[in-house]
């Protein structure tokens, strides 16, 4: 019996030792996780080969293009077949895709048909030069995970394809950072700002304007010449002179509407506006000169009226030609 208290005492000591050795962990004694070190983004080599550009539509501000694009990288989760984004494309589709994952790297090749949107520079139309831009991004990974590098081997476009009415002056590929001032609803982001690596291709095209210029402005110049001929109608034919001049005025206005219908809307003052405005001004000046001649005839000063018509005709024609040449020259030099 005397051993029982000793046994109970020993058991209590063992139980207490076990209880304190397995004490529950509280937030006070939990070790904090180590801070994440700065990530080094993976590099994706990208290249492009444009095979055609067609269906350039100035009114709808778009054009169509076919091209091959390829990506070479290590991380399979980048998945450019599903994550490729072309921000300035209205629509695009892949007519061919292939991928290779040998040697621990991923190679993706795609043939894409796209309808691209663009803002045309029409200030110097039809002596204009256009800069067509295409950009490519990964829709899932920002610049902290992925940066593009240019695969500069070979050319960026097929020199054999011809673009009707245009000449390709140059091409350039570049890598930039595109900022988005939004968190896209992700509360975990520290700010409403994200940066994505962007691969961009720029083609500079110059319009072959000779034939197009005369096609669009020949009616305007003929209308001016019809009004100009009024100076050589005898002073007695004022009805004919006024009729021809007013008819020419409306012909120029009609030609302006026809030309504008093929161009996108613009708030800037263009070469088309300048040439039509100049022609309208000179036709109005011809009508005003005709009115002065009529007044001189009614005053009985017919010879003076004839002399006034002759001098005014030469001055108007010279100024009109000089200003036209100047405006056209400026348009060809300002691209």
Where are these regions (language model features)?
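Bacterial N-terminal signal peptides
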Residues: 7-16
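Soluble non-transmembrane domains of integral membrane proteins
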Residues: 21-204
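Generic detector of bulky aromatic hydrophobic side chains
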Residues: 119-120, 166, 217, 232, ...
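Intrinsically disordered, low-complexity peripheral segments of secretory-pathway and membrane proteins
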Residues: 17-77, 261-264, 268-335
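Bacterial N-terminal signal peptides that target proteins for export
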Residues: 1-6
């Amino acid at each position: 019996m005397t051993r029982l208290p000793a046994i109970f005492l020993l058991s209590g000591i063992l139980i207490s030792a076990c209880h304190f050795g397995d004490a529950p962990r509280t937030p006070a004694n939990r070790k904090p996780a180590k801070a994440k070190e700065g990530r080094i983004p993976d590099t994706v080599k990208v290249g492009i080969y444009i095979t055609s550009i067609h269906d350039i539509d100035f009114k709808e501000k778009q054009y169509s293009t076919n091209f091959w694009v390829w990506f070479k990288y290590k991380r399979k989760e980048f998945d450019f077949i599903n994550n490729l984004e072309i921000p300035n494309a209205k629509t695009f589709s892949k007519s061919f895709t292939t991928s290779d994952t040998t040697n621990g790297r991923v190679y993706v090749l795609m043939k894409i048909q796209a309808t691209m949107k663009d803002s045309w520079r029409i200030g110097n139309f039809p002596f204009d030069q256009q800069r067509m831009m295409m950009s490519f991004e990964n829709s899932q990974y920002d610049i902290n995970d992925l940066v593009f590098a240019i695969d500069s081997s070979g050319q960026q476009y097929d020199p054999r394809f011809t673009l009707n009415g245009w000449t390709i002056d140059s091409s350039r590929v570049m890598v930039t950072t595109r900022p988005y001032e939004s968190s896209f609803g992700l509360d975990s982001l520290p700010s409403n700002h994200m940066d994505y690596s962007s691969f961009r291709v720029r083609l500079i095209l110059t319009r072959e304007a000779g034939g197009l210029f005369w096609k669009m402005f020949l009616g305007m110049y003929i209308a001016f010449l019809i009004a100009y001929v009024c100076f050589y109608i005898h002073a007695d034919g004022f009805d004919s002179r006024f009729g021809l001049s007013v008819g020419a005025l409306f012909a120029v206005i009609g030609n302006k509407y026809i030309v504008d219908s093929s161009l996108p809307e613009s708030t800037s003052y263009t070469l088309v506006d300048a040439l039509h405005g100049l022609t309208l001004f000179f036709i109005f000046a011809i009508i005003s000169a005709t009115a002065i001649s009529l007044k001189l005839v009614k005053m009985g000063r017919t010879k003076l009226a004839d002399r006034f018509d002759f001098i005014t005709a030469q001055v108007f024609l010279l100024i009109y030609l000089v200003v036209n040449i100047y405006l056209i020259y400026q348009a060809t030099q300002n691209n």
